[in-house]
Amino acid sequence: MDDRVHPEVRRTATEIDTMEIRGAATIADAAARALRTQATESDAADAEAFRAELRATARTLHETRPTAVSLPNALRYVLRDMSSTTVEGLRQSVVDSADEFCARLERAQADLGQVGANRLRDGDTIMTHCHSTDALACVEAAVEQGKHIEAVVKETRPRNQGHITAKRLHELGVPVTLIVDSAARRYLNDVDHVLVGADAVAADGSVINKIGTSGLAVNARERGTPIMVAAQTLKLHPGTMTGHTVDIEMRDTAEVVDDDTLADLGNPTVKNPAFDVTPPRYVDAIVTERGQFPPESIVILMRELFGEGTSEPWAEPSPRAEP
């Protein structure tokens, strides 16, 4: 890591990389707070040195999770105004933007939860995959409305994020049935909605989420079970409007099999993709803090929020051409 990056920020980057910090909204919040820390602790001598230091910090954070689009969206928001000519002016801009971003993040999830809860009826059973605070916000809001909700929770290997979801649902008073991932098709007849989160949503309405989401969506469509994706607008991937693709992160082999077992199996090649892509035709609604949208309408929302292009504040500025 760049020596200019504050130790606390390095620690945050490591925790994001190792998934100690997980969940797109949680990652975005941590990234914004890390930039704030860098800004407040910086002893840069002048404005240009301060900007370079913040770019290095943003790069360090950005490189940790290439698929979690909430991370670069958080970096863009916090570093959106770096026009001041003084260190103190720049520092204040970063601090104010980070504080505003984190406050908006908290409000957005509550608003999203209300929108999603309106799709859930009293007595409904949902099926979940992985762990999504946005999806859980929908359930929490429904419970607060007095609705009785039950849940079938996929364990979500290899890291068992479904266990986190099961624990949180239990805390909300929701009866939980925990199932192995491969049993999902069997239990789809018992559920009224599939409710998942998203790490990113592309301009065409495709949903990038934890590996296994697309297979669940295909099975749900076959069974006629509606699929609701809960995703704050910070999960929208503006780069996909201009043809950029979403990188699918490959996780460490050790998450799947330990070295001794691998050797005993004859050292086969092990693939551990963290995410997959669910085509929009398998998604019924994408629920955001700004309302619910059919997947084909997401590009309109993206244009409203981001315009036609995006900046990358972690990139070094291009050298000026000689006159």
From Swiss-Prot:
Q: Which GO terms describe its biological process?
A: L-methionine salvage from methylthioadenosine; pentose catabolic process
Can you state which reaction this protein catalyses?
alpha-D-ribose 1,5-bisphosphate = D-ribulose 1,5-bisphosphate
Query: Which sequence ranges form a coiled-coil region, renumbered to this chain?
Result: none
Q: Gene3D superfamilies annotated for this entry?
A: translation initiation factor eif-2b, domain 1, Translation initiation factor eif-2b, domain 2
Alphabetized, the UniProt keywords read:
Carbohydrate metabolism, Isomerase, Isopeptide bond, Ubl conjugation
Q: Where is this cross-link: Glycyl lysine isopeptide (Lys-Gly) (interchain with G-Cter in SAMP2)?
A: K210
Q: Which residues bind substrate?
A: R22, G23, A24, A25, R65, N209, K210, K235
GO MF term set: ribose 1,5-bisphosphate isomerase activity; S-methyl-5-thioribose-1-phosphate isomerase activity
Stored InterPro entries:
IF-2B-related, IF_2B-like_C, Initiation_fac_2B_a/b/d, M1Pi_N, NagB/RpiA_transferase-like, R15Pi
According to the UniProt record, what class of enzyme is this?
isomerase
Enzyme Commission code(s) on record: 5.3.1.29
Active site: which residues? C130 (proton acceptor), D199 (proton donor)
The record makes one more remark, namely: Reaction proceeds via a cis-phosphoenolate intermediate.
Q: What role does this protein play?
A: Catalyzes the isomerization of ribose 1,5-bisphosphate (R15P) to ribulose 1,5-bisphosphate (RuBP), the CO(2) acceptor and substrate for RubisCO. Functions in an archaeal AMP degradation pathway, together with AMP phosphorylase and RubisCO.
Which HAMAP family did the record assign?
R15P_isomerase
Q: Which family does it belong to?
A: Belongs to the eIF-2B alpha/beta/delta subunits family. R15P isomerase subfamily.
In its UniProt entry, what is this protein called?
Ribose 1,5-bisphosphate isomerase
Please name the source species. Haloferax volcanii (strain ATCC 29605 / DSM 3757 / JCM 8879 / NBRC 14742 / NCIMB 2012 / VKM B-1768 / DS2)
